[in-house]
Amino acid sequence: MSVFTHLSLSPINIAAALCSAKAYNSAYAKGEQMINETMYARGAESSIIREIFSYGLERKAQIGAENVFDFSLGNPSVPAPAAVAESIKKALELPSDQLHGYTPAPGLPQCRAAVAESLNRRFGTSYEGKDVFMTVGAAASLTCTLNAVTNPGDEVIVIAPYFPEYRVWIEKAGCTCVEALADEDTFQLSVDNVLKAITDKTAAVIIDSPNNPTGAVYTCDTLTRLANVLREANAQRDSENPIMLISDEPYREIVY
């Protein structure tokens, strides 16, 4: 077994990488543990969502894809919009350094400005490009956000049932995942349960609407009451340590 890492190709870095690989291989041969046990355990656990997805692939091979309705991972079953396909084709014509090169860490300035303009036009906000930080997927965004607004030992509230990866990202930031049960009849966010879950260690509350996995769309009244509760809680706290509201919105555009 070998370990490879992404390093600039200087003699010092190459030597360091080779030494690290040799040390790892030596320890591996001796049966020594060289990896994070907590993360290994999480990776070794079976994911029911992935199991269902794999089962769906098997059934498609057996009886035909048109006879299987797979609701596991949420893969699209329709073609991409024409505008998306055309944009991808156009991107392939960019100069090589733009197509394959690195972007600034927060993302391309023109892309950030376009996102800010879209949000302002649709939601009446007043963002600027500098307020937008681009990531590859929501997982990276939530990981960065949690690392930015929490400290080890803090607590982060999630609305149960919730997307399982929230717990992984929260605990990886050194925080405790605290569950606030949704309304059992409507799956609406229960403001009362969120209020009960708030402690001196609460650093953030994560919500997503439409919700994964329930599909519930939080009402304006529910969100307004949640905002008021958090404002009241923050009024009693140190102004430098407010409870942050993190809104995960991968399904914002999918409301039926």
Descriptions of predicted regions:
Residues E249:
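Walker B catalytic acidic pair
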